[in-house]
Each structure stands twice: as C-alpha cells, then as structure tokens.
C-alpha cells in the first residue's frame, strides 16, 4: 500500500503559453506573486512540479518562482530534434509573456545546463544564475563517477531504446512507493545519510516523487531525448558566459560527483563554487533552499 502523505501545496494553477511555434509550454508558479522573478529549471527525470521545493523560502524572501516544463515533459508539447541551445528563446518568449525585463535563474540537477545556456544567450536579461547539484558537460568532461543509473540510461538509449522506455515506466511505478517499501527501501540504502534524512520528510518525498512521476509516465521519447541532450555537445562555450553564476554542490552527492561539477564551474569565468559538507543530491535542494535563495537577494 502507498503511505498516506500530506498534499503538496499548489498556490497557482498550471498555466499554458502558446508559443510562436504553435507548441504549448506549461509552467507552474510558486512563492510571492509580486516578488523578484526567478525561473526554476527542473531536473531529470522531473517536471515543473519540482518547483514546489522553493515555495516556502521563496514566499518568505519575496521571490516569484516560474517553473516551466521542458518540451515533451509534463504538459508541454514535444519538440523533435530539440537542442540545448534552443531553450533560451523559449524562456525569452515566456519572460515577455509575463512582463519580465530581467530575472534570475536556478537550475537544479538536470536543469543546470539549461540555466547556463540561458545565462549565455540572454546576458542583458539574466541577473544571475544558481546551479544546484548541476549536471556537468559530459561530452567535454566525461562520465567518471556519474550515478550508475544515469550511465545505464545513456547506454540503453543508444543500444536498446525499447528497454529504456520500459525501465522508465518501472521507475515511475517505483517512485510512487513509500521510502520504507520495496524497491524504494533498497534504493534509499544507496543514498548518503543526508539524502535519506531529507526524503524521510513526507512532504519532501511527495514533491520529489510526484514531479518525477509526471515525467516518467509521460512521453518516453521526449524524456529520453531530454536525457541525451546532457551527453551531447552543448553547442555553446561556457567561457563566454558573462553574468554571475554560483554553483552549489554537496560533497556527498552520489548522483553527480563533485569533481565533474567543479570542472564545469571552472570553465565559467568568475563563477563562485560553494561546497556543502555532507550534503547529497537531495538534501542540498530540499534542506538548504533558503540559504541558496538568499544568495539571489543579497
């Protein structure tokens, strides 16, 4: 049986923007509706619903969070042959729709590259970017130390894509189980202590798993395409980023090794890199949210 958990708070209804391309872009809003604009880019596999992890701190600090679904994820329409460098135009269009002249970015895990490419492409509009547990430039720096599940997904997509599609559905089912139920009880043993503590909070667990299930039970082709973007050439030069970028990474991150994150950060001129002792891939964004967001309003 699924464990009863508290409902997530959804302050604003999901919104849909019809892009100039004719495709629909879905997004959710969190935090202070009159606050400082911040685009939140979700991880992989995840969705706009992950933005709720910022809700409490964003409301407290006066930040308005806009969390879009990437194409083909959640409620957004799929865009075949999409590249990482196609993302900034989508965000620019969304910003114009919302009336934002300037804004901040926060990329979590797989959302990190999307924040970096947007910072590169829109220097006159981006005030700064936060990269939290960010995915590294795999084509440039390699995959050594990357979580085994990520490496398996990359290999499967290239060799037996039908098996990956089945695996993603199975992962969606697993994400619906409580932490003390199989198979989550087994997977949780692979997490560092800080991650287990963070996910033991029923609300944290529900937000993270619900956002993942939204992606995992969606279009498998879109999700795998989104994943393959990370290991392809990103299509832009990190050294050309001209806005402030602050990387945050836990030294106990079992998903994305610290050394790969550091290599990516080193390629960004003037980037700040904060190492959080004992934090993992989940505890950092779930338990240190206010500390991270305070860096935006400082």
Regions found by a protein language model. Name each.
Residues 270-298:
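Catalytic active-site module of serine/aspartate enzymes centered on a nucleophile-bearing elbow/loop
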Residues 149-152, 156-236:
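Alpha/beta-hydrolase
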Residues 86-104:
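Conserved acidic catalytic loop of the alpha/beta-hydrolase fold
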Residues 241, 247-249, 253:
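Short beta-strand/loop motif that positions the catalytic acidic residue
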């Amino acid at each position: 049986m699924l464990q009863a958990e508290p409902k997530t708070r959804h302050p604003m209804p999901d919104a849909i923007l019809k892009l100039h391309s004719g495709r629909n872009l879905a997004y959710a809003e969190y935090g202070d509706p009159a606050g400082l604009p911040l685009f939140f880019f979700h991880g992989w596999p995840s969705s706009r619903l992950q933005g709720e992890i910022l809700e409490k701190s964003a409301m407290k600090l006066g930040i308005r969070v806009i969390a879009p679904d990437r194409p083909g994820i959640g409620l957004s329409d799929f865009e075949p042959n999409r590249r990482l460098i196609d993302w900034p135009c989508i965000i620019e269009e969304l910003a114009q729709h919302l009336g934002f002249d300037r804004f901040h970015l926060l990329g979590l895990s797989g959302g990190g590259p999307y924040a970096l490419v947007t910072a590169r492409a829109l220097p006159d509009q981006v005030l700064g970017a936060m990269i939290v547990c960010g995915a590294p430039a795999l084509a440039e720096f390699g995959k050594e130390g990357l979580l085994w599940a990520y490496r398996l997904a990359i290999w499967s997509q290239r060799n037996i894509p039908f098996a990956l599609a089945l695996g993603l559905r199975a992962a969606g089912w697993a994400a619906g189980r409580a932490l003390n139920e199989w198979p989550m009880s087994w997977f949780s043993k692979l997490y560092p202590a800080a991650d287990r503590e963070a996910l033991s909070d029923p609300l944290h667990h529900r937000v993270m798993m619900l956002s993942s299930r939204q992606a995992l039970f969606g279009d498998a082709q879109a999700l795998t395409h989104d994943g393959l973007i990370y290991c392809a050439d990103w299509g832009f030069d990190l050294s050309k980023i001209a806005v402030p970028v602050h990387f945050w990474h836990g030294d106990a991150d079992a998903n994305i090794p610290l050394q790969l994150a550091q290599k990516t950060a080193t390629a960004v001129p003037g980037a700040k890199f904060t190492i959080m002792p004992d934090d993992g891939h989940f505890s950092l964004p779930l338990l240190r949210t206010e500390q991270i967001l305070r860096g935006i309003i400082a």
